[in-house]
Curated annotation (Swiss-Prot):
Its EC number is 2.6.1.16. Residues 4-146 form the SIS domain. It comes from Sphingobium yanoikuyae (Sphingomonas yanoikuyae). Homodimer. GO terms for biological process: fructose 6-phosphate metabolic process; protein N-linked glycosylation; UDP-N-acetylglucosamine metabolic process. GO terms for molecular function: carbohydrate derivative binding; glutamine-fructose-6-phosphate transaminase (isomerizing) activity. It is found in: Cytoplasm. This is Glutamine--fructose-6-phosphate aminotransferase [isomerizing]. It catalyses: D-fructose 6-phosphate + L-glutamine = D-glucosamine 6-phosphate + L-glutamate. The lineage of its organism: Bacteria, Pseudomonadati, Pseudomonadota, Alphaproteobacteria, Sphingomonadales. Keywords: Aminotransferase, Cytoplasm, Glutamine amidotransferase, Transferase. One of its GO terms (cellular component) is cytosol. Catalyzes the first step in hexosamine metabolism, converting fructose-6P into glucosamine-6P using glutamine as a nitrogen source. It is an enzyme of class 2 (transferase).
Length: 156
């Protein structure tokens, strides 16, 4: 994951795609990257990619695809292919069979254990957070005290 972070460091923008129960993890991954590395990142539902985010795709915008094996995997692969057809660079986070099926042509892959789709977001959160951490460290930001963040929210 640390070696993969080198590919993300120069980016000004990063997109995270997730489908189904992995969509909130795409949002969380983008939030973590923004908070500690100060790179603009957005999380999107993979099925909504054609409704806006696809216009942002080029060779300078890495796309992190969170795609566990399961019934929605092939649909996410279709999104990955659309990104690659536009010159986008894909980082695939998937189980071994997913990486074998769709990893060719990706900028990088992270191979995860095969788990039930309902617990995949908990398992896949680890590499998503580690990627944000390593990008921030490589950029030289203080990951323990991100700028302008409060530890709590005050309600008035």
């Amino acid at each position: 994951i640390e070696a993969m972070a080198h590919h993300i460091v120069p980016a000004r923008d990063v997109l995270y795609l997730g489908r189904g129960t992995d969509y909130p993890l795409a949002l969380e991954g983008a939030l973590k990257l923004k908070e500690i590395s100060y790179i603009h990142a957005e999380g999107y539902a993979a099925g909504e990619m054609k409704h806006g985010p696809i216009a942002l795709i080029d060779e300078l915008v890495p796309v992190i695809c969170i795609a566990p094996s399961g019934p929605l995997f092939e649909k996410t692969v279709s999104n990955m292919q659309e990104v690659q057809a536009r010159g986008g660079k894909v980082v695939l986070i998937s189980a071994y069979d997913g990486v074998q099926a769709a990893g060719e042509g990706c900028l990088a892959t992270i191979t995860m254990p095969k788990v039930h789709p309902l617990i995949a977001p908990m398992v896949y959160a680890v590499p998503v957070q580690l990627l944000a951490y390593h990008v921030a460290v490589l950029k030289g930001t203080d990951v323990d005290q991100p700028r302008n963040l409060a530890k709590s929210v005050t309600v008035e």
